[in-house]
Each structure stands twice: as structure tokens, then as C-alpha cells.
Amino acid sequence: MAVVWSVVTILLGYAVLDVADAAPGVLTLRPLPPPAPTEYVATRTLPLVPQPTPATSVAEPLPPLAGETAAPSPTGIERALAAVRAVPALRDSALVVRDGQSGDVLLDQRGDELRIPASTTKLLSAAAIGRAFAPGETLRTVVREGDTPDEIVLVAGGDSLLAPGRGDPRAVAGRAGLGDLADQVASALRARGTRSVTLYVDETYADGPRTAPTWASTFRSSGITGAVAMLGLSSQRARGGAAGPADPVLSVRTAFAGLLDARGLAVKVAARGRAPGAPGSPMPTPMPTPTSGSTPQTATDSTATPTTSAPTTGPGAVLGSVESAPVQEQLALALTDSDNALTEILARQAAYRSGAGTAFAAVGAWVVSQVAALGLDTAGVTLSDASGLSRENRVRASLLSDVLVLGYDGRHPVLRRALDGLPIGGLTGTLADRFTGADHVAAGRARAKTGTLTGANALAGSVVDDDGRLLVFVGMVAGVGTNDARAALDRLVAAIASCGCR
């Protein structure tokens, strides 16, 4: 009977958002997305948990809640959360609860302490990445002529989600297809009578190290993260227990050569090195970057003109090209699956386009600078990567709440779109298996980014309370076992969801 009630409560909780037009579903005339798999982020001492294949798409974006309901009071929140805050796992935690519409702080417990954020770092990275790419902007993978008629150059343009065959216009992972690119190139070469070519790869766009020096050596080999590269196949995304390739670019090159061979071309693969006609360090035209204290972006997806990003690395004619899903959709997918490599790939490109370095620490510093440019207080905040795998990262719960409020209150539409990719409690992504027990009241009502490293656990997102009010929460727990920390944080969110708290 308890299981039945849990299922019923999950469905009723999701229906609350659905009726309010705050979640996809039949009541909003939107199809429910397929549930994305759970991704666990392990570290040196945690056992690795095998995972299913990551999602290829994300849930439909959630529009703002309709109607005006009174916000909870700080006194009401204090009273409602008193019992859960007293549990051992949360006594020394950093907790912040805020009203999602006004941004008013309803609870602040050690919110200004610097803590290890784990994967909630991705919230800061999402805010920064959203400033560097135009709404609707895609990434273009190009093949062009080399210096001679029998040379072709595959130009890495930042798309790490290429389908190995045909592209799928409905997917985020696999929108652009390597097979489609091979069709174009083979057709162009046949039209001019070319039957034999040497294939080069131009890797100069946003190139950098594959893994960070502050990561555990087992992170890539165990599938916690993939290698960070500006070309990759959607079929080779890393997942816990199943590692991706050590060199994604090499995998793409080999696959593309095979596709051309299957289309009747004799292909010789060139050794690694500088591609014909490629400059030493191509730099695409950077997006205008607002300065610190300036007004946040206000362009919306519906009014912006989509653009395509591709490095220009030589005078050779283009023989074929394919375009990725919009960057904002890739960013949402990275949040849904807590995809460490994809987050790093997008952040590195964003930093590179802005003129920053491509080393992990340089990208982390760039993320902090962009968050500061949004007018948020980043004093003392340090990031050694963009994904949150580094234990050297330090962030305040109050800053994470600032970023969430900025996304939800309408001041930063691109960030809001990214936040639509946050997992839904009990339903999708890294929250698919949470809020399914005694805390099921938050199932379907909470969206949050998880964070898990040994001795450092976090949960940051939003939840709709019993009065239909959107509230933002951040919880950061240190020195507690992962299971105890997760249970306590889930109980905290459930208490917020159950609260009118006026």
C-alpha cells in the first residue's frame, strides 16, 4: 500500500505543475519526454555504479508559473524546516531558501561559507556559457579543401555530439550526422572527378588538455567523464562504468574515413599535426561580452536570429557541413545528465570565444568572471574546472541561489532555458530515482542540480510549494556519507514542498 501511495503522490505532484502549465504533459498539450537515466558522480573511494545510456534530448522548457500567490514568510519557513534542519546530516550544512519571484531570502544558514560545490558548479557554468553564445546558436562541423585537390580537412567546430550515421532533427545528442557530412563530401568530390584523398583534421579551434590535473586519474577510465575535445560522437558519450574514448577526435576521424570509403573513395588518413592551410590559432569573432555590473541579457529565443559558430581555418572551399542542436539545448542536456565532459566542452569554447585560455583552470576563472559580470558577488569563489569534478572548487550557497533566482525571475532568458534542463524529482536525469519514498511529496515538483563527491554533497534548484509558489533552495553538506546526505537533502526539499509557510 505504501508503494501505491508513493506512485499516486508522484503523479499528483506532477499534475500540480502540469495544471499550472509549469511542466510538460497532456494537460498542457505537450508530450512527456522520455525519462533520462540517472548518472552517479563517483570519486576515488566510491564504488562505481553502471549506468544506462545517457539521454539524447531533454524535457520541454517549463514556462513560469501562472497566477499570483503569496510568498512564504521567513518565520514560516523556519518553523516548517526546524525538524529537518536538526537531523545530524544537516546541522553543519549550508542552506539557503529564497522566493523564486522576488528573490527574497527566506532562510540563510551558513550561506556565505565557501564549500566544495561538486556538480552544482554547472549552474555557474551555465550562466557563463549563456553569455557567450547567442540564443539559438549552433555549432558547425565543416569539411573543406586542403592545399591540393586531393587533400580534405575535417575542421573540429565544437560539436561533441555527432551522430555516427544519419542525424536526427529531433535529438540533441546526434542532431548533426557524420554520415550526412560524408554524403555531402563524397558527392562534391565525385562531381569534380576526385576518387582518392588524404584526410586531415584541424583541431586548432579551442584545443586544450583532455582531462584536468585536479581530477582523479580514474575519472575518465571509469566513465565519470569523457575526454574534453572539440569533436566527438554521441554514441561514445561516457557514463559511469563505461568509459568513452581517450581521444574522441581520433575516433571521429577513423569513423569519417570509413564512411567515405563506404561511399567509394580511397582515403589515406594523415598523421596528427597541423592541417593544410590552418593558422596557428584560429579565433572566431567573439560575442560581445557585457562588463561587470551591466544589465543582464534580455534577448529571448523567439526573437533572436539563430546563428552558427564555426572556426574559419583556411581558404579552401567548403565541401560539406552539418550543424548541431542549439548550444542552449546542449547545455540543458548537460544539466539533465550531469554530463561533465559536455559541460567542459561548452565552457571551453565559450571562454575561447571571449579570448580566455583553454586550460581547465583558465576556463574556471573565466566562468567566475562571467558570473561576476552579471552583477553577482563572487568574492572568494574559485573554480579549477567548469564541471565540478575538482575538489579545489569553492563556492557559496548564496551565490548558487543568486544564479537560480537570476534564471527564474526573467532577467536572463538564456539561463532560464538552460535551467529547464534540470532533472525533475522522481522522473528524469539524476533525480529519476530520488523523491520516491517518504519524501515523495516533492516528486514532480522539484527541479534540481545534484552534486556528489566524497564528503561533499549538494542539491540546488527549485520546488513548488503547497500554495503554488516557486521557491529556490540550495543545500550543501560536508563530511557526511553520500546516502545520509542525499536522504537529508531530499527530506529538506520535501518539507519545503509541503509548506505554505506564511
Model-assigned labels for residue ranges:
Residues 132-148, 269-270, 415-418:
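Short, well-structured active-site flanking segments
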Residues 103, 117-135, 231, 255-256, ...:
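Active-site SXXK
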Residues 36-113, 135, 182-193:
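Beta-lactamase-like hydrolase cores
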Residues 22-79, 268, 273-314, 432-438:
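N-terminal low-complexity, Pro/Thr-rich disordered segments
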Residues 227, 234-416:
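A small/polar active-site loop signature that marks catalytic segments
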Residues 351-502:
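Small-residue-rich helix-loop
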Residues 1-35, 42, 197:
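Hydrophobic single-pass membrane-targeting/anchoring helices
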Residues 141-219, 227-252, 325-366:
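Active-site-adjacent helix/loop patches that line small-molecule binding or acyl-intermediate pockets
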